[in-house]
From Swiss-Prot:
Mediates both basal and acquired thermotolerance. It is found in: Cytoplasm; Nucleus. It comes from Arabidopsis thaliana (Mouse-ear cress). Keywords: Cytoplasm, Nucleus. The keyword Protease does not apply. It comes from the Eukaryota. Coiled coil: none annotated. Expressed in seedlings, leaves, stems, inflorescences and siliques. GO terms for biological process: heat acclimation; response to heat. Belongs to the heat induced plant HTT protein family. One of its GO terms (cellular component) is cytoplasm. Its main location: cytoplasm. This is Protein HEAT-INDUCED TAS1 TARGET 3. Induction: Target of TAS1 (trans-acting siRNA precursor 1)-derived small interfering RNAs in response to temperature variations. Highly up-regulated in seedlings exposed to heat shock.
Length: 126
């Protein structure tokens, strides 16, 4: 067989198959396209919400790049940035004191008779 026949035979054998590097590049391109579409949907939703909430008088077409560039941390502290919203041992103890421990004592005070094992088993197997 000469070179042309070998080349044509290899093309015929690999018809419909793609090189792994080619498939990887194609998949990455599809991922990029999906990310770009998701960014545009987010931009359109933000613009629509701003019009509905009357923050903007007209629909503004932001670019996805504008959204990425301006997605940084706010200058003012938000609710989750405040010290009272941070998960610390002190905040956890304060929450437990206000919402759990006191209410547990109230429930025990309301109960006239002590809870027995039989009561627990009956409740578990209902």
């Amino acid at each position: 067989m000469d070179m042309n026949q070998l080349f044509m035979q290899s093309i015929a054998n690999s018809r419909g198959l793609c090189h792994p590097d080619c498939e990887k590049a194609n998949n990455e391109r599809e991922d990029y396209d999906a990310s770009q579409h998701a960014a545009m949907v987010a931009v359109n939703l933000i613009s629509s919400a701003r019009v509905i909430l009357k923050l903007d008088a007209v629909y503004t077409e932001y670019s996805a790049q504008y959204l990425v560039d301006n997605a940084g941390k706010e200058d003012n502290q938000g609710e989750m940035d405040q010290q009272s919203s941070q998960l610390t041992l002190q905040n956890l103890l304060q929450y437990m004191d206000e919402n759990v421990w006191n209410k547990k004592e109230d429930v025990q005070g309301e109960r006239e008779q002590p809870l027995t094992v039989k009561d627990c088993l009956e409740c578990a197997f209902k």
